[in-house]
């Protein structure tokens, strides 16, 4: 009886190691994005089309820009630098995800023209504000790296939207027989 029980701990340890490795290598997209609130994550999950998701990410990016403007308008608050860095990173994440969804929508030949046009209209506004912040010099020195990343992400999103508009042909026009 004791002889049969000895392999059990070895089998159990092997199983637990395999389960741990499987859990560690599970896809990252199944996890909640750390820069989205629970309500925002829920909206993304509930969106039925890629176009709606892109528009949501653009609106979340706009919200982060608005919060950045507020933070710079009220300089004396506690933990301000931390919040600003978090907002800049969250903005870059939203823009990156919106841009990634545009590329995915084009690859899958989905109807995302409205979302592409929204990205093309809103992203230049975001870029102008970020460049204005970057030009402030010493007052934004501690945010410079994150700000540069956000500017790069916005430039990439603008470029991706322009490329996607060229690649994403409009749907065929249905004509009535005469």
Give names to the regions the model predicted.
Residues 18-27:
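C-terminal segment of classical bacterial N-terminal signal peptides
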Residues 2-18:
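Bacterial N-terminal signal peptides that target proteins for export
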Residues 29-178:
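Long, charged/polar, soluble alpha-helical segments
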